[in-house]
Structure formats: C-alpha cells, structure tokens
C-alpha cells in the first residue's frame, strides 16, 4: 500500500472527495454495531483497492474510527490496519496470490496466543460503487462495470459514472480473542476464517444489490411454459370458445399488466428526488429494527414486507428507507388504480407490480398472478404488500385481506427451499397528506379516482410535515408457522399436492391476524399521536399547557417503564419539547390569557385529529381500562381489576389487534408503576391520590368510547340473548348512532359497521351469542361495562335498549 502522505494518494483522495458521495450502512457504526473504541481494530476487506481504502479513509475520519492508513502498533510490532482477502487485479495477467493476506490472518491470530490480554476487533467492510444487480443475460455494460473483480481501469470508470452512489457497509466486529480461545491460532483456523469471510462478503453483496434481474420478455416466455398457466389457457379457450392462441395472448396481456420492470437507473434517479422530497417534507425519519431485517436477508431468508397502509407515501417511504439501510427495495404489490400515467410506469420501473382489487373468478388471471408471485419468490426478490388491502381512513388497522397471504403460503407449500419470513412494518407520520380527504370520505363524499392531477395537487400542498416513523416488527417465519399449525403438512402435500388441506383457511386467517398484531406491536408513540390522545380525552379538547405537559410526561414514563413490546418506540424528550414540536407543526392551537397558556384542538379538525390518536390507542388501552376501574370504584382491589380486564381483553384484542403475552403480569406492572408515580396508594387495595385525580381521569377517558360500545352490545345481549349476529350488528350500530347524537360523539370509528362485525365474530367465538350457557357471564360483563360509564351515558344506553327490545 502506498504511504498515506504520498503525492499520488493525496491527489487521489482530493479527486475522490469531489467525485464521490458515500452512504454509510449502518449510519452510526458505534451505535448499531458492537465496536469497542477501547480495543484495537483491524478492517477486513474483500479486495485490495487504493480507491476503496481512500473512500474508507474519508468515512473513518468522520466517525472517529482509526484511519486505514494508520498501522496498528502492538508491543513494538507494526500490523497493517487493513487485511484483504484478495490482491488487486491487474489490467492484464493474473491477480496477486492471496497467500500474503492469509499470512496476515495467521500473524494476527498468533499475536493472541502470545498476549493473553490482547483482543483485536476484526471489522468487515464492504464497498459498492453503484448497486446494479446486473441482468441474467450478460451484457457489454456488465463487462465494463464488472463490480466483483474490477481492474484499476474498470474501477476508475465505476468511480467516474457511479461515484455519487458509493455505499460503505460495516458489519459486526469479530473478536479475534474469541476465535483464538475457541478455535486456536494455527494456519488451519486462518484458512477457515478466510472461507467464512468470503461467504460473508458474497452474502452482503446479494443483500445490497439483490438477485440478477430477468429480461422481461424471457420471464414472460418462462411463465407461459408453466403447467398451471398452460392449463388455465386451455380452460380459457374452452370456456370462452376462443382459440388457444387468443387465450395465450390474453395471458400475455395479463402478464404485461401485472409484471414489474425494475430499473436500477430509475431507482438511482428516484433516490435523488426522494432525498429532496423527504428533506422538504420531514424534519427526520425515525427507524427501528432495520438491523434484524438486514440479518434475515444476510441469512438467506425470502423477505415479504407487510406494512400497514396510511398513505400513498407508504410505497415510497419503505423502499427509500430500505435502500438507505443497505437492502434492495422490494417488488411492491400496488393496486391497479395506481397504474395511471405518469405514476404507473414510474412505479413499475421502481419495482411495483399491479394487482386488481378483485379477481372475480377469472381463473386465467388468477393463474398468471400466482405464477408470477411464485417466480418472484423463487428468484429471491423481496416482496411487499399491504394486508389491509387499502388505506385506513380512521387511523386504526383495517381487518386484513387474506388473498396475498394465502398465495404466499401456497408458494411455500409448492416447495420454496429458503425460509420465507414475513416482516410486519409500522409506518407512521406526524402528518398524513390525505387525512382531510379521509374525513370527507367518512362523511359520505365519494372517493376520487387517482390521477396525475391529484399528484400535482399533493405536491402543491407540500409543507412541514414533522417526522416519519418506520418500525420493523416481530418477523414471522412461515415454515415455522406451518410446523406449529400443521406439523405433518409436508407429508400431506407429498401424498396429494392438489388437495387443499382442511387446516389451510383457518391457518391463513390466524396468520393474517398475527401480522396485524405484530404491526401494532411495533407502533410509534410520537409527539402528535400522544398529544392527540391526551387532548381528545379532555373536556372541550383543551388543557392548560402545564397540565398537558404533565400528562405527556406520565405517558412517556409509562410506555418506557412498562413497554408494550420491545418493537414499539416512544418519542424522545419530555412533555414540554413534545408540545413545542406539535405547535411548530400547527397541529394544535395555543391561546394565552392572564392565567397561562391553553393548548387545544381546533374544533374544525377534531375529527381529523382522532386519526392520529387511533394510531396508538391500543398502547394505552389497558392503562386506560385500569384507570377507569379506579375512577368508578371508590376502593378497587387488585383482584377486581384483574377480573374486569380479563372480561374485556378478548374484545380489545380483537378490535385493536393487541399483543400482550401475559396480561395479568402486564396489569400488575401498570398498577405498580401508578403507585410508584404517586397516582395511587395501596398495594392490593388502591385509592387515587387526590392531587393526581385529574391525571387518572384523563387516562380513563381514553377508552371511554370503546367501553360505551361494549355496554351497548352487552345490554342488548342481556335483554335479548337469542339475538343473531346480523341483528346484533344492526342494533348496535343503530344505538351507537343514537348515543352519538345525544352525547356529541364524533369519532368515525364509533359508527363503523365493520367494527361491530369484528366484535360480533369474537362474541360468537366466545360463546356469548345465541346461547344460555354463558348468560351469567354476559350479565356480569354488562354490569361491569355499565359501572365504568358516566351515569348519563349509562342511562341513555339502558333506556334505548329497553325502548328497542323491552318487553
């Protein structure tokens, strides 16, 4: 290696400084990797390269890491800071032998046998000049920009054309002390370490670039040869009384409508545009859990991203985040309604494949789509689809659509060798661009068809949207899931591959529910969602600022002390900084008088702000239910609280996709927290501390409308136990409308017919419908629900039910 202060290297570094723009993965190696700044460190690279080391030098300087040009001094010995697996590839002739680098490994290991206290950290570093995966059919471009083993001339061409798209990826540090203690220090271990390192670099490249891209027409030709599509073409020909060739042309049209046409060039251009867009829209994007997903990719998993659907921005945000986190943007299942010019062609080139809202029994379309999805999985492309099927208008997760999940499981059953893993993703925003439109649609206005004019209209309204949130939830390995649901599934399929197993549909439904549960398990309690939650629980949607800040501090402490799950995230800062942030976004109104400052929700947008509250209401459901018990019982013991929570939790779980493994333990942790915070006194019998009564009342109010719904349902069941599901749903909806009109309830979800359908399904499952067996339980839950309501609301419900069904 040339000396770092040589004229050549100084000139090279100066040139690269102007030509190269580098993105580091992960963004903070000290934070995200187990690098210990107190221990000696050596970088491991795949190929010796002057330009790569120059680029690495710029990065290490910025992070305060040792320079690759600075040798490691150990007890009088000088060791190179960089160890490479391969020498430089000359323009002509063979590459330099790797023996020199193997000797470096051996010498590093042997140092540990001589010095028991020594622990050198070996940090693998990968550099990528551009991220083109290449085509399955080789081309001149691939020859010129050969990225795996470039000569110095090819490397200069890569820097010239792709220098603005340089990625440097650091991996977890490997302890050579651990290697030496566990495996020894001889040359055999150095050989093994070299082999492992080669596999690591090969996998890292695939994670960063993805599999090679197929020629689109060659892909179509391959798919048309599949048995399922050939059979569907023959059936189409027979059923529609057209020629086989005509049916084949229809299949090609379907493929052309569906298939993505991924372009790395467009992705690079889009990356520049999206960087500008995010910087204009958002003050930051908060990411949690990306490292676990990167590891799944590295371990060879087929990844299927299943995010919640808040906004059309979701398509762009997740792909952008994955790109910057060193992973390939997925192929995204987009609704056919988005296939309009110019967005459709751009989405398609960015990896979108289009799906119709309904297959309408079209067997040929179904066969083509399934085979295309199978091909994506078989070739190793990451896939993304929205299990809700559409954007939520209320801020709550929608009931999942199971079609894509069923096709994914079918692909596993058809014999994908790699593990297939679903990665739930929570997407959140301080401002959703379409939220005002959602309010209009919920009020009865017809949904507008997507068009280029809507895009221009949205761009015109761009402003300060605060922050975005991308949290990756608990992954679901499909092979493991199937092993749990049907341990003999492989044997069953081997006996009769064409027979749909009896366990298939129940398993798909369970999987869909688990996906939604894991999405909510990764929720982000942000400044806007928390403030909306507090203010909408207050009378007139307004609080004195210091009171609001205290309530926010309480919720922040609760969510951090008793975390909902390890995947959820909580806003940084305190109540004051959160209120300041929300006011800077013009989300709330600040009014000052002689006494102080009042923060409120503008009555014109109160319904709109319920959208943000609903994003995280499940996080506070149990604390709020516990607070409600404490408010409505003069003295409330631990046993009573447990009993009431266990009565309502099955309904809360079904309605809010909640995921608490040990509910009694979670309840105890919340009670202990409330005692520690001084809100309550007692250890088994609790009373609210008088000076904290307002905080407990506000907390209890969060779930009040939910309890009102349950009171409606159980009062109906108590007075008429033989109600059918359809009758219960109809009458519950009718009484909810009446209650809302009398008591000013405006939240859209309060009147949502689909919500009452979800609850009726759960009640049927629990045995509470059309059965006298559980009548005592129904009466008990009705009494508990009534007790947790204000006297006026309770009386309205009781009187209305008796008027409707009284004898």
Curated annotation (Swiss-Prot):
EC number of this enzyme: 2.3.1.15
Motif window: HXXXXD motif: 308-313
Comment block on domains: The HXXXXD motif is essential for acyltransferase activity and may constitute the binding site for the phosphate moiety of the glycerol-3-phosphate.
Pathway: Phospholipid metabolism; CDP-diacylglycerol biosynthesis; CDP-diacylglycerol from sn-glycerol 3-phosphate: step 1/3
GO BP annotation list: CDP-diacylglycerol biosynthetic process; fatty acid metabolic process
A single GO cellular-component term on record: plasma membrane
Catalytic activity: sn-glycerol 3-phosphate + an acyl-CoA = a 1-acyl-sn-glycero-3-phosphate + CoA
Leader sequence residues: none
Enzymatic class: transferase
Record membrane topology: Peripheral membrane protein
Family of this protein: Belongs to the GPAT/DAPAT family.
Protein name (record): Glycerol-3-phosphate acyltransferase
Localization of this protein: Cell inner membrane
Matching InterPro entries: GPAT/DHAPAT, GPAT/DHAPAT_C, GPAT/DHAPAT_LPLAT, GPAT_PlsB, Plipid/glycerol_acylTrfase
Keyword annotations: Acyltransferase, Cell inner membrane, Cell membrane, Lipid biosynthesis, Lipid metabolism, Membrane, Phospholipid biosynthesis, Phospholipid metabolism, Transferase
Any matching Pfam family: GPAT_C
One term of GO molecular function: glycerol-3-phosphate O-acyltransferase activity
Matching SUPFAM superfamilies: Glycerol-3-phosphate (1)-acyltransferase
């Amino acid at each position: 290696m040339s000396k770092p202060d040589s004229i050549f290297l100084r000139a090279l570094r100066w040139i690269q400084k102007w030509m190269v723009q580098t993105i580091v993965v992960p963004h903070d190696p000290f934070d995200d990797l187990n690098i210990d700044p107190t221990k000696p460190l050596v970088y491991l690279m795949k190929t010796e390269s002057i330009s790569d080391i120059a680029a690495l030098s710029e990065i290490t300087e910025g992070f305060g890491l040792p320079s690759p040009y600075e040798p490691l001094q150990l007890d009088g010995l000088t060791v190179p800071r960089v160890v490479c697996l391969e020498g430089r590839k000359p323009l002509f002739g063979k590459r330099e032998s790797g023996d020199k680098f193997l000797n470096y490994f051996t010498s590093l290991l042997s140092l540990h046998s001589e010095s028991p206290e020594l622990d050198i950290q070996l940090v693998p570093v990968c550099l990528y000049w551009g991220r083109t995966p290449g085509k399955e059919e080789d081309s001149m471009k691939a020859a010129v920009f050969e990225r795996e083993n470039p000569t110095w001339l090819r490397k200069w061409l890569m820097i010239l054309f792709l220098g603005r798209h340089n990625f440097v990826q650091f991996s977890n540090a490997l302890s050579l002390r651990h290697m030496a203690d566990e495996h020894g220090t001889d040359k055999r271990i150095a050989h093994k370490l070299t082999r492992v390192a080669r596999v690591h670099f090969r996998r890292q490249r695939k994670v960063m670039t993805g599999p090679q891209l197929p020629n689109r027409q060659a892909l179509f030709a391959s798919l048309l040869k599949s048995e399922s599509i050939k059979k569907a073409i023959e059936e189409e020909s027979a059923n529609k009384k057209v020629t086989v060739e005509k049916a084949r042309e229809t299949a090609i049209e379907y493929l052309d409508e569906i298939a993505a046409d991924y372009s790395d060039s467009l992705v690079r251009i889009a990356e520049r545009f999206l960087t500008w867009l995010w910087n204009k829209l958002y003050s930051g994007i908060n990411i949690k859990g990306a490292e676990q997903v990167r590891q799944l990719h590295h371990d060879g998993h087929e990844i299927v991203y299943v995010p919640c659907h808040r906004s059309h921005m979701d398509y762009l945000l997740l792909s952008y985040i994955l790109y910057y986190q060193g992973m390939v943007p997925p192929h995204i299942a987009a609704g056919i309604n988005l296939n309009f010019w110019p967005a459709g062609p751009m989405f398609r080139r960015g990896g979108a494949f289009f799906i119709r809202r309904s297959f309408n029994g079209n067997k040929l379309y179904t066969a083509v789509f399934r085979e295309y999805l199978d091909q994506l999985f078989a070739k190793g492309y990451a896939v993304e689809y929205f299990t809700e099927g559409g954007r939520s208008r209320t801020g709550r997760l929608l009931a999942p659509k199971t079609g894509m999940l069923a096709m994914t499981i079918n692909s596993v059953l058809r014999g994908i060798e790699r593990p297939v893993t679903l990665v739930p993703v929570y997407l959140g925003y301080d401002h959703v661009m379409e939220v005002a439109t959602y309010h209009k649609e919920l009020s009865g206005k017809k949904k507008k068809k997507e068009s280029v004019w809507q895009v221009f209209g949205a761009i015109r309204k761009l402003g300060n949207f605060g922050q975005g949130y991308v949290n990756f939830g608990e992954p679901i390995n499909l092979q493991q899931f199937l092993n749990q649901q049907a341990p003999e599934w492989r044997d069953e399929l081997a006996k009769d591959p064409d027979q749909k197993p009896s366990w298939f549909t129940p398993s798909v439904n369970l999987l869909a529910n688990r996906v939604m549960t894991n999405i909510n398990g990764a929720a982000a309690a942000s400044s806007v969602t928390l403030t909306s939650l507090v203010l909408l629980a207050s009378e007139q949607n307004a609080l004195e600022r210091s009171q609001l800040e205290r309530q926010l501090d309480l919720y922040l402490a609760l969510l951090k002390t008793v975390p909902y799950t390890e995947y959820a995230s909580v806003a940084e800062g305190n109540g004051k900084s959160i209120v300041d942030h929300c006011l800077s976004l013009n989300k709330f109104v600040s009014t000052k008088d002689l006494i102080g400052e009042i923060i409120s929700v503008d009555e014109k947008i109160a319904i709109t702000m319920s959208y943000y509250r609903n994003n995280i209401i499940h996080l506070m459901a149990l604390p709020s239910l516990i607070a409600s018990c404490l408010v409505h019982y003069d003295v409330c013991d631990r046993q009573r609280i447990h009993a009431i929570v266990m009565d309502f939790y099955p309904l809360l779980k079904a309605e809010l996709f909640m995921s608490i493994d040990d509910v009694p333990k979670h309840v105890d942790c919340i009670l202990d927290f409330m005692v520690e915070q001084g809100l309550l006194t007692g250890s088994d019998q609790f009373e609210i501390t008088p000076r904290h009564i307002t905080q407990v009342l506000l907390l209890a109010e969060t779930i009040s409308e939910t309890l009102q719904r349950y009171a409606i349902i159980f009062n109906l069941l108590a007075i008429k136990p033989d109600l059918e599901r359809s009758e219960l749903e109809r009458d519950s909806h009718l009484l909810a409308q009446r209650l809302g009109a009398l008591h000013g309830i405006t939240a859209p979800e309060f009147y949502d017919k689909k919500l009452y359908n979800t609850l009726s399904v759960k009640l049927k499952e629990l045995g509470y419908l059309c059965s006298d067996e559980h009548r005592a339980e129904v009466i008990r839950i009705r009494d508990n629900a009534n007790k947790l309501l204000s006297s006026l609301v309770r009386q309205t419900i009781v009187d209305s039910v008796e008027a409707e069904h009284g004898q």
